[in-house]
Amino acid sequence: MDTLCSTLLLLTIPSWVLSQITLKESGPTLVKPTQTLTLTCTFSGFSLSTSGVGVGWIRQPPGKALEWLALIYWDDDKRYSPSLKSRLTITKDTSKNQVVLTMTNMDPVDTATYYCAHR
């Protein structure tokens, strides 16, 4: 009976729940001080044209907590970390399913692993 119930429940899950969302970051692994970092997030499994959807960037310096950087919404509304706002630009290209983050005037304190995320 348990197997039958599990099977029936699985069959009633909407198809959108089963779709797979993927995001992949790309860009240079090393940037010299004062240079500009440009990172690209290429995604699939959702549309950045859909109301309520956003893609953001976060980073994690070695041995430290995650830090939120920027977020862009379907309607092109953009939000930035107040402490980094003057150095960040976030843009989207819905035709390519990409979001690009640019960070100017890089410094050794910006050493981190950078991630993009779906909202």
Swiss-Prot record:
One of its GO terms (molecular function) is antigen binding. InterPro entries: Ig-like_dom, Ig-like_dom_sf, Ig-like_fold, Ig_V-set, IgHV. Pfam families: V-set. Residues 20-44 are annotated as: Framework-1. The modification Pyrrolidone carboxylic acid is found at Q20. It is found in: Secreted; Cell membrane. Residues 20-119 form the Ig-like domain. Residues 117-119 are annotated as: Complementarity-determining-3. Residues 1-19 form the signal peptide. GO terms for cellular component: extracellular region; immunoglobulin complex; plasma membrane. Residues 79-116 are annotated as: Framework-3. One of its GO terms (biological process) is immune response. Disulfide bonds join C41-C116. Residues 45-54 are annotated as: Complementarity-determining-1. It comes from the Eukaryota. The keyword Cell membrane applies. Keywords: Adaptive immunity, Cell membrane, Disulfide bond, Immunity, Immunoglobulin, Immunoglobulin domain, Membrane, Pyrrolidone carboxylic acid, Secreted, Signal. Its main location: secreted. The keyword Disulfide bond applies. Residues 72-78 are annotated as: Complementarity-determining-2. Residues 55-71 are annotated as: Framework-2. Immunoglobulins are composed of two identical heavy chains and two identical light chains; disulfide-linked. V region of the variable domain of immunoglobulin heavy chains that participates in the antigen recognition. Immunoglobulins, also known as antibodies, are membrane-bound or secreted glycoproteins produced by B lymphocytes. In the recognition phase of humoral immunity, the membrane-bound immunoglobulins serve as receptors which, upon binding of a specific antigen, trigger the clonal expansion and differentiation of B lymphocytes into immunoglobulins-secreting plasma cells. This is Immunoglobulin heavy variable 2-5. The gene is IGHV2-5.
